């Protein structure tokens, strides 16, 4: 039984219809974060929402993270994790675990939930069919003792350089739902771990997606009084980074949004992935949810 009256159900559908028409046959890239995955019921609700998108003539492409799951496995195996510039330092032993968790465990679990909900999902990583080529990430940090910048070696961590859409376009054409683990291959054939937000931005940009949704563990971009900012232009987003309003882990997320917009994505939204049906609320309601960043 539902507590929603028939009249309210009709109003909900009436509100959703123009949004469904707006996204008809469009591609939506959804980055599903490790923290946003939540518990099993939340994950299954997410899967049902993805299937609903496909059934309403939208082309969903899911990119997932897996930071918490990787950390759990590394701890179980007694491998210490180190971070620099917000990125995991990934040595040869760690990249094997990262690939096992992302491509072998997390990816297949999401695929299973989507298929259980009636969809036809296909699990892949950026390594498959050389979909995503990347170069090793270079970062610098300031040494606190000398105040001198120095380069740091992050190991097998990469930044996307090229996305080959051949396989993705075929899957979308067959009405299959791609679920992508953020792994890529270097020109030397090495496996590289790519930040999931960055990976999703590169894929969305290559696909010229209508929307990129970044599901996170926060409601969106917050102002200095911790209130949600519903919309931001790229110009305003850069100002908020400069004045410190956008800080910490939100900076690379917003930078990913800006990059995706520059590559041709129409709009990027940072939303709270722990909220039930966050994807549907963003796409199919007038108010939406989270922070929309646009040109």
From Swiss-Prot:
Protein's job: Catalyzes the ATP-dependent phosphorylation of N-acetyl-L-glutamate.
Originating species: Bradyrhizobium diazoefficiens (strain JCM 10833 / BCRC 13528 / IAM 13628 / NBRC 14792 / USDA 110)
Protein name: Acetylglutamate kinase
Compartments in which it is found: Cytoplasm
Biological processes, Gene Ontology terms: arginine biosynthetic process via ornithine; L-arginine biosynthetic process
One Gene Ontology cellular component: cytoplasm
Catalysis performed (reactions): N-acetyl-L-glutamate + ATP = N-acetyl-L-glutamyl 5-phosphate + ADP
HAMAP family: ArgB
Keywords per UniProt: Amino-acid biosynthesis, Arginine biosynthesis, ATP-binding, Cytoplasm, Kinase, Nucleotide-binding, Transferase
Family: Belongs to the acetylglutamate kinase family. ArgB subfamily.
Record site: Transition state stabilizer: 31, 253
Gene name of the record: argB
Main location: cytoplasm
E.C. numbers: 2.7.2.8
């Amino acid at each position: 039984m539902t507590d929603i009256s028939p009249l309210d159900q009709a109003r909900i559908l009436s509100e959703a219809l123009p949004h469904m028409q707006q996204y008809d046959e469009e591609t939506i890239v959804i980055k599903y974060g490790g923290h946003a995955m939540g518990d099993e019921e939340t994950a299954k609700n997410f899967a049902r929402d993805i299937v609903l998108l496909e059934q309403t003539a939208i082309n969903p492409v899911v990119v997932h993270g897996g930071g918490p799951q990787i950390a759990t496995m590394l701890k179980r195996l007694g491998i210490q994790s180190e971070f620099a510039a917000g990125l995991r330092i990934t040595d040869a032993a760690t990249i094997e675990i990262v690939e096992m968790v992302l491509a072998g465990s997390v990816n297949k679990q999401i695929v299973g939930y989507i298929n259980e909900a009636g969809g036809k999902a296909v699990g892949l990583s950026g390594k498959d069919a050389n979909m995503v080529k990347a170069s090793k990430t270079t970062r610098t940090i300031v040494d606190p003792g000398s105040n001198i910048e120095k380069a740091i070696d992050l190991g097998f961590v990469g930044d996307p350089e090229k996305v080959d859409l051949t396989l993705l376009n075929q899957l979308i054409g067959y009405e299959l739902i791609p679920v992508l683990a953020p792994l890529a291959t270097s020109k030397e054939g090495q496996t590289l771990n790519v930040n999931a937000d960055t990976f999703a931005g590169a894929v969305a940009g290559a696909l010229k997606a209508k929307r990129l949704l970044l599901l996170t563990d926060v409601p969106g971009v917050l102002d200095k009084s911790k209130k949600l900012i519903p919309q931001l232009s790229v110009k305003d987003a850069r100002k908020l980074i400069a004045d410190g309003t956008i800080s910490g882990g939100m900076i690379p997320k917003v930078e990913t949004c800006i990059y995706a917009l520059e590559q041709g994505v129409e709009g990027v939204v940072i939303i709270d992935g722990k909220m039930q049906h966050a994807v549907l609320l963003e796409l199919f309601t007038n108010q939406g949810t989270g922070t929309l960043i646009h040109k």
